[in-house]
Amino acid sequence: MSRPYEEILNGGTLPRSAPGDRHETICARLHREMAVSIAGLTGVQLLAPRTQVQIARATAFCPDLALVMAATGKLFLAAEIISRDDHRADTVTKKEIYEQHRVPRLWMVDPRYDNVEIYHSFEFGLKLHGILAGNEILQEKLVPQFKITMKELFA
């Protein structure tokens, strides 16, 4: 069973509710597919769900899925599964921090609507690259083996 946890935002704590069963099922599916997809890739490392990742000197988040560069530990891709109970922390607060620190890829996974918003970093912040739902496929060209349909992810 999941437990509540805390993230660090500008030196203060950001308490988070324990993820629910559906949240954890979606997280497990993402991790399973990503683990298979990066097998043999030496440049990236998949962290365990909600491993604390340093974003800035006084800010550390616990993404549901985090891919970091193996050589530097720098966050490359973060996936946040939005919780109905405290969605503002993910959809506003953390997204702004990810944007400020130019995290290259951000997936906002929304079980409320069974969709995923994909953001790519560019020189002015994060840009919405697409919103996927239904039979559409979540994929990342920098991890070419990773592919999962929205129906599979949210089943």
List PLM regions with ranges.
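Gly/Pro/Ser/Thr-rich low-complexity, intrinsically disordered segments predominantly at protein N-termini
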Residues: 1-155
